[in-house]
């Protein structure tokens, strides 16, 4: 470059440096930035909101049965179905009244027709394959393939919304501890109106711990990427390594120990697996089972003991039928039989009790063989939150003449052996459990669980309770008084949330007015039933390829599944048969009459 060109450029550079900087165009402080239109939840009837630009959106109404800008114009067949379909409250009334009519229905083919209808209508409310997860509020391959996530029924509230619930309610959600103290904490024990007992509460807790496996390391939106359904991982362990530590490797059986002439789970000295016990509990006092936290409550270890005995009992029956089978085949086939027993008991006794229906529910996978049905399941975050039913827990635990406080009951490592299975089953079957819905029935020892669920739901940005009601085909509530059915709690909710459309998902489920003679409100039934039935009937053993006698070792194993009951589960594995039922005795509908006979196995 020449000296002349440099001399010409220098003044130009100097001039540029001395000039004032160009003006910066600032946004007018008086003009608010556009609100994400999807924060208003404009798309109805399961339409999908897609944002375009800053303040435009489009509703994808594909296969919703509706059209129009917001998916609100019904197609002719949709209109006809909606016009003819009875409301959930009317359907519930029909199913819980007219006992003698239902006695006739249960004895005819109509029962199977109605059962098929119940399963298909409920299951169709759950998307399959899964759609959303915590990280993806849109359809993605990750949402489908990555089983480390809980799936989501509704996407999260967009991050850029004016309020935590979208556009409704206050800028800040109420203090969690204040909310729990005012509306969830028990003033006095409110028993369940159906005669529900503490045995039911422990059965529910034991059962659900096989598929609610939140990852403590990854966070509340993640599972341990293991089973997403009824796999009995809480009995056999959720990894092959844990399973191998629990197995005897002889005749298909699980390890056990004999104490006072009775069979119990092995100690951690005999089965080297991690169990969560307080410091200072010696290894010989720690029982080793599939779920590491079951040492917390004697009721959970009670059912672990019963299922251990049942597994080894079934192994003996299969060994007699198939003397040539090796340990592995005996173990694997027995596991399938116990999965079948579990599903049968859950549908025909557990769900039956929860529903309060006079229609007798039936576990028959063949009902779906001609229907379009996917035999796979993914656990949803909403299902996990919904199932925190800690109001079932009483103020204390009554065993015989002794009353145990929570401090005496938790991590009580001697109670199960001291009393024995029969005495604990009998005691828990006779003690009333609490009402779940309606508010103010959490014992203060378990109130922190509710607070943790609400905290997690805020981290995961769950949509409002009313948005979930709409998703499951229910009409949204228009006021807190309509929601609670009374004035005092409604006024407190108005003060805390400011708008019924800002009420959170879990508080909504716990505070909703209960249906007549029911443990909880309409929403819990209408949201919980689809998750449950899809998860149970979506199990592989219910598929046409699996549901046949050969899968279960022939007619003997198949018959065990098809005739399973709570009473048989207990009484075939105890020396005498205690009172066993999900209802306290002398309550209408109780079927737990005692019959005493020796066990043939112990």
Swiss-Prot record:
Tell me a Gene Ontology molecular-function term this record carries: oxidoreductase activity, acting on single donors with incorporation of molecular oxygen, incorporation of two atoms of oxygen
Name the PROSITE patterns for this protein: EGF_3 (PS50026), PEROXIDASE_3 (PS50292)
Write out the similarity annotation: Belongs to the prostaglandin G/H synthase family.
The active site of this protein is located at 209 (proton acceptor), 387 (for cyclooxygenase activity)
How is the cofactor bound here?
Binds 1 heme b (iron(II)-protoporphyrin IX) group per subunit.
Q: Which UniProt keywords apply?
A: Dioxygenase, Disulfide bond, EGF-like domain, Endoplasmic reticulum, Fatty acid biosynthesis, Fatty acid metabolism, Glycoprotein, Heme, Iron, Lipid biosynthesis, Lipid metabolism, Membrane, Metal-binding, Microsome, Oxidoreductase, Peroxidase, Prostaglandin biosynthesis, Prostaglandin metabolism, Signal
Membrane spanning stretches:
none
Q: Tell me what this protein is called.
A: Prostaglandin G/H synthase 1
- What is the predominant subcellular site recorded for this chain? membrane
- Which residues belong to the signal peptide in this entry? 1-26
Q: Which organism is it from?
A: Rattus norvegicus (Rat)
Site (Aspirin-acetylated serine): residue numbering on this chain: 532
A single Gene Ontology CC annotation of this entry is: endoplasmic reticulum membrane
Concerning CDD domains, the annotation shows: EGF_CA, prostaglandin_endoperoxide_synthase
What range(s) does the EGF-like domain occupy?
Answer: 34-72
Miscellaneous remark of the record: The conversion of arachidonate to prostaglandin H2 is a 2 step reaction: a cyclooxygenase (COX) reaction which converts arachidonate to prostaglandin G2 (PGG2) and a peroxidase reaction in which PGG2 is reduced to prostaglandin H2 (PGH2). The cyclooxygenase reaction occurs in a hydrophobic channel in the core of the enzyme. The peroxidase reaction occurs at a heme-containing active site located near the protein surface. The nonsteroidal anti-inflammatory drugs (NSAIDs) binding site corresponds to the cyclooxygenase active site.
Q: Give the record's GO biological process terms.
A: cyclooxygenase pathway; learning; maintenance of blood-brain barrier; memory; negative regulation of epinephrine secretion; negative regulation of norepinephrine secretion; positive regulation of smooth muscle contraction; positive regulation of vasoconstriction
Q: Pfam families given for it?
A: An_peroxidase
Necessary cofactors:
heme b
Residues bearing attached sugar chains per UniProt = 70, 106, 146, 412
Q: Which gene encodes it?
A: Ptgs1
């Amino acid at each position: 470059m020449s000296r002349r060109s440099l001399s010409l450029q220098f003044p130009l550079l100097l001039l540029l440096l001395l000039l004032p900087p160009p003006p910066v165009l600032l946004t007018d402080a008086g003009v608010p930035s556009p609100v994400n239109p999807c924060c208003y939840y404009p798309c109805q009837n399961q339409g999908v909101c897609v944002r375009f630009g800053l303040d435009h959106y489009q509703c994808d109404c594909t296969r919703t049965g509706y059209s129009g800008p917001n998916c609100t114009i019904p197609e002719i067949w949709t209109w006809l179905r909606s016009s003819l379909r009875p409301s959930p409250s009317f359907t519930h009334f029909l199913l819980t009244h007219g006992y003698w009519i239902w006695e006739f229905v249960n004895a005819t083919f109509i029962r199977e027709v109605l059962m098929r209808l119940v399963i298909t209508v409920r299951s169709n409310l759950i998307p399959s394959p899964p759609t959303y997860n915590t990280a993806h509020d849109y359809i993605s391959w990750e949402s489908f393939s990555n089983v480390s996530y809980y799936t989501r029924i509704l996407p999260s509230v967009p991050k850029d919304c004016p309020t935590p619930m979208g556009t409704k309610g206050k800028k800040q959600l109420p203090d969690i501890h204040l909310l729990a103290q005012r509306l969830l904490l028990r003033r006095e024990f409110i028993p369940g109106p159906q005669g529900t007992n503490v045995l039911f509460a422990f059965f529910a807790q034991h059962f659900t711990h096989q598929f609610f496996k939140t990852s403590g390391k990854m966070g509340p939106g993640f599972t341990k990427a293991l089973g997403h359904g009824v796999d009995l991982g809480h009995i056999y362990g959720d990894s092959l390594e844990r399973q191998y530590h629990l197995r005897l490797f002889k005749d298909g059986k699980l390890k056990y120990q004999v104490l006072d002439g009775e069979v119990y789970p092995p100690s951690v000295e005999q089965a080297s697996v991690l169990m969560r016990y307080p410091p200072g509990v010696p290894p010989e006092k720690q029982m080793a089972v599939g779920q590491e936290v079951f040492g917390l409550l004697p009721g959970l270890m009670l059912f672990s003991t019963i299922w251990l005995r049942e597994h080894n009992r079934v192994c003996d029956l299969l060994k007699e039928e198939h003397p040539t089978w090796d340990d592995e085949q005996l173990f694997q086939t027995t596991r399938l039989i116990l999965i079948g027993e579990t599903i049968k008991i859950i549908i025909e006794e557990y769900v039956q009790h929860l529903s309060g229906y006079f229609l007798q529910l039936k576990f028959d996978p063949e009902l779906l063989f001609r229907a379009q049905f996917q035999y796979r399941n993914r656990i949803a975050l909403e299902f996990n939150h919904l199932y925190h039913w800690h109001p079932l827990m009483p103020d204390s635990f009554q065993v015989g003449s002794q009353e145990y406080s929570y401090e005496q009951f938790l991590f009580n490592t001697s109670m199960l052996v001291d009393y024995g299975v029969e005495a604990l089953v009998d005691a828990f079957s006779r003690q009333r459990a609490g009402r779940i819905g309606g508010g103010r029935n959490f014992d203060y020892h378990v109130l922190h669980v509710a607070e943790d669920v609400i905290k997690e739901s805020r981290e995961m940005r769950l949509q409002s309770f009313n948005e979930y009601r709409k998703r499951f085909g229910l009409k949204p509530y228009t006021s807190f008084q309509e929601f609670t059915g009374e004035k005092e709690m409604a006024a407190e909710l108005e003060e805390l949330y400011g708008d019924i459309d800002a009420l959170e998902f879990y508080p909504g489920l716990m505070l909703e007015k209960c249906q007549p003679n029911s443990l909880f409100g309409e929403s819990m039934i209408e949201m919980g039933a689809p998750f449950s039935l899809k998860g149970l009937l979506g199990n592989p053993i219910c598929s046409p390829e699996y549901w046949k006698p050969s899968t279960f070792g022939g007619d003997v194993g198949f018959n065990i599944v098809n005739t399973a009951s709570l009473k048989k589960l207990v009484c075939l594995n105890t020396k005498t048969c205690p009172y066993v039922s999900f209802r306290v005795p002398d309550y209408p509908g109780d079927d737990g009459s005692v019959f005493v006979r020796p066990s043939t196995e112990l």
